[in-house]
Structure formats: structure tokens, C-alpha cells
């Protein structure tokens, strides 16, 4: 009887200690079981897209949901890209998939080891827009308003061109390279 109680006690301690491990290292499967993919950021494409090295030495391209950052050739592109690198390059992150985008990139939310969501940090710092067309997160909307009011990051320019406007003009054959204040209808 005492032996069975002791074995049960040891088994309970073992289960409890394994369930308390974080998803930040050798117990990556704990996070994956909770709907997350754990990996290391190995490449920064721009301010809203990066490459994640996951289990099996596989690389997946991630497009952060809810935000849109300046595209290559747009003002503030390098600053936004470098800020994302500062936040997560060579860091282990947790990725929560929401699906695929039109370019077949993995779309979702990225979390740092402290639990911060990277897209929220990018918008708060004025390094990206809240992508309202595809995301209705009120916190992201408020973070964008705060960054705009404080003139942080890209909001230092009174009227920066949003990436979706840049893409629209590009599809129409209109170059926006080096243009900070072009507005729809002013082409």
C-alpha cells in the first residue's frame, strides 16, 4: 500500500514538472500541442514578414496577421525591417497560425518569450499600420492611433502612404519611389 502510494506520488510529481516546462527550449512540443509552432527567426523580409526555422530543419515564411509594413522601395521600409529584426531576429518565438495569405505565406500571430505579440509592438512603435481591411482588433487600432498622435516611427511624416495604397498605385503603373505624401487622386 505504501509502495503504491509512493509510486503514485512520484508519477504525479513527474507529470506536474513536465507540464510546467515552458515552450522556450527543449519542450517545444508543449507549445505545439497548444496550437503554437515554436521556432527561431532566421530571416527578416520586411516589417511584417520573416522566415522561421522550425523542427526538422524546415523553414517557413511568416506574414504577421493584423499589420501592414512599408514595402521595399517605400519610405521607412528599412527602418521598419530593422525594427522587426531588433525585436526577434535570431530569437525563439511562438507562432499561432491563422491560415495562409494570397501568396501562400503562413499567416498568424508571433509571440516573444515574454508573451508580447510582435505585430502589436510594431504598430505601437509606429513601424507598421493596423491592417484594418483584414483585421478588426481594437487594441491594434488604438495602438495605431497612439503612435500617430505621438508621431512615432512612420507617423513622423504627417501623411505617410500606406502599403496597400502603394501596391494599388504600383498595379496602375504609377511609381511612388521616394514619395512621402502622394495621396490617392493626386497621381
Q: Which residues are covered by each model-predicted region?
A:
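Small beta-barrel nucleic-acid-binding modules, primarily SNase/OB-fold domains
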Residues: 2-187
Amino acid at each position: 500500500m505504501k509502495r503504491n502510494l509512493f509510486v503514485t506520488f512520484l508519477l504525479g510529481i513527474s507529470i506536474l514538472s513536465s507540464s510546467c516546462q515552458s515552450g522556450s527550449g527543449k519542450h517545444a512540443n508543449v507549445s505545439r500541442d497548444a496550437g503554437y509552432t515554436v521556432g527561431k527567426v532566421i530571416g527578416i523580409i520586411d516589417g511584417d514578414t520573416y522566415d522561421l526555422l522550425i523542427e526538422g530543419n524546415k523553414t517557413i515564411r511568416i506574414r504577421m496577421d493584423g499589420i501592414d509594413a512599408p514595402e521595399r522601395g517605400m519610405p521607412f521600409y528599412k527602418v521598419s525591417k530593422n525594427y522587426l529584426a531588433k525585436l526577434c531576429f535570431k530569437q525563439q518565438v511562438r507562432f499561432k497560425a491563422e491560415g495562409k495569405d494570397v501568396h501562400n505565406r503562413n499567416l498568424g500571430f508571433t509571440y516573444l518569450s515574454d508573451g508580447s505579440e510582435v505585430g502589436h509592438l510594431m504598430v505601437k512603435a509606429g513601424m507598421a499600420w493596423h491592417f484594418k481591411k483584414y483585421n478588426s482588433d481594437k487594441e491594434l487600432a488604438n495602438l495605431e492611433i497612439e503612435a500617430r498622435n505621438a508621431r512615432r516611427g512612420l507617423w513622423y511624416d504627417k501623411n505617410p502612404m500606406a502599403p496597400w495604397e502603394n501596391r494599388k498605385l504600383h498595379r496602375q503603373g504609377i511609381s511612388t519611389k521616394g514619395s512621402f505624401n502622394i495621396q490617392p487622386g493626386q497621381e
